[in-house]
Structure formats: C-alpha cells, structure tokens
Design a protein with these regions (language model features):
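Canonical positions in the second alpha-helix
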Residues: 36-38, 74-75, 108-111, 146-147, ...
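C-terminal motif of bacterial Sec signal peptides marking the signal peptidase cleavage site
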Residues: 15-17
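Hydrophobic face of amphipathic alpha-helices that form TPR/SEL1-like repeat modules
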Residues: 49-56, 86-93, 97, 120-129, ...
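Bacterial signal peptide processing site
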Residues: 19-21
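Terminal, low-structured helical/coil segments at or just beyond the last alpha-helical repeat
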Residues: 211, 215-241
C-alpha cells in the first residue's frame, strides 16, 4: 500500500495574535469599540489588540497593515513585547512594503534574550532557512527547543521536524513523536497530526497502531486536508476497518 504521507519542514506562519499570545482578542462589536476607545486613551494592551484586529482582519474589518503597524508601534513604545513580536513577523513576511529582514532579525534577536517564545521560534526559522543569517541547523534546533519548552505551538512542531529529519540533533523518532503530539494536544496542529499518523501507520518511533493513525488523520481531515481524508479511505479499504 502506498501511504501518501507529506513531511512538512515548517508549519504555516502563525501570527502571534493567534495561538502564541497571552492576550485573547475578542471580536464582537462591543469589544472592538472598547479596544478602540482604550487604545486611543493610551492603553498598550488595547493598542496591541487593535493591531491584531487589523493584522488578521477580525470582526469584519479588512486586513490593514498600515493600521496594524500603527497600533503595534504605539504598544511597543510602551514596552508591550507581543506587539514588538508582531512587528517582527510583519517585517519577516515577504511581499509587503514593511518587509525588512534586517529589522525582523533585530527584533527577534532582542526579544529572544527575554525568552519571548514567538521571537525564539521565528529566529529559529531564520537560522533554519538562512534568511538574514548564515544557515545553521544547530542554532535553529536550540532556538526551537527553547521556544517549544516555553509552549510555542509552531516551535513544538518545528522541533519535532528537527528530530524527525536529524537536523541540528541526532535523528530521534521517539522525540519527534513526542513533540508532534505536544503540538496536537496544545493546538490541534493538522500538519503534526498527519506526520504522526504516518509514524503510527509505519510503527516509526511509536508502536504501530492503525486505529491511532486514522484518528490522527481525521484531525487533519477535519481542517480541510484532502490528502489526509484520502489516506483515511485508503487505510480503511486496506484493513477493512
């Protein structure tokens, strides 16, 4: 049987305002109005929240990087670290007028010294890909490791990949499975679920378990992953389960 397992090197870029932030942004009209008023009155958390609203296009608002940057800068001026991290992500993201790899590197490097998990993860990505720095898997691994232990979901997935591929560390499928599972438990990471499903299907780093493989593939399929859905049907036909 051919199992269409896709091995992803890195997860989709995740904005700090989503899964990595300590600030939860509610998107009701009343909350948005409250954020706007408090932001204008100088509240750094409200300013950060307004930045997230425009960065992600919440509550029917269109994505507006100009407004997002405006509010993140206001919050950052008052020491709001998550706002600084989001500015770093905007600088890192390709294809906008704000793209500036040097500023992204400076921002993430500064915040990483304060154990900001988002900055550590993105700095790890820069070293893994050789973006703005000399490519270095060892540094990437160490940065992902720090961020993963601090609870960053993307870093947990990325650390799993480093163990899976033996990059910056000896290949270790058991540790890869551990960190993929962390990303699934903490954030229902569909990419991690699909890779771990393949590991259970093959018995690689974990005890072979077809039912567990199907269960994990379903997590990815529920998020719209057509390949995962197809694999479920293939496995069920092969095993008659």
């Amino acid at each position: 049987m051919k199992f269409f397992l896709s091995i992803f090197i890195f997860s989709t870029l995740t904005l700090v305002g989503c899964d990595s932030s300590n600030v939860k942004v509610k998107s009701s009209n009343s909350e948005l109005s409250k954020y706007q008023k408090n932001a204008e009155n100088g509240d750094p958390i409200a300013q950060y929240n307004m930045g997230v609203v425009y960065q992600q296009g919440l509550n029917g608002e269109k994505v507006d990087l100009d407004k997002a940057v405006y509010w993140f800068e206001k919050a950052a001026e008052q020491g709001e670290e998550e706002a600084k991290a989001n500015l770093g992500i905007i600088y890192y993201t390709e294809g906008t007028k704000y793209t500036n790899i040097t500023k992204a590197l400076d921002t993430f490097s500064e915040l990483s010294k304060k154990d900001n998990r988002v900055a550590l993860n993105f700095l790890g990505r820069m070293y893994k890909d050789g973006v703005g720095v000399k490519q270095d898997n060892n540094k990437a691994f160490n940065l992902f490791n720090r961020a993963a232990h601090l609870g960053d979901l993307s870093a947990q997935f990325n650390l799993g990949n480093m163990y899976f591929n033996g990059e910056g560390t000896p290949l270790d499928y058991e540790k890869a499975a551990y960190w993929y599972n962390k990303a699934i438990i903490n954030g229902k990471d569909g990419d991690a679920a699909k890779i771990l499903a393949g590991m259970y299907y093959e018995g690689r780093g974990v005890e072979k378990n077809i039912n567990k493989s199907i269960e994990l593939l379903q997590i990815a399929a529920d998020q719209g992953d057509q390949e995962a859905a197809q694999n479920i049907e293939i496995i069920k036909r092969e095993c008659g389960c």
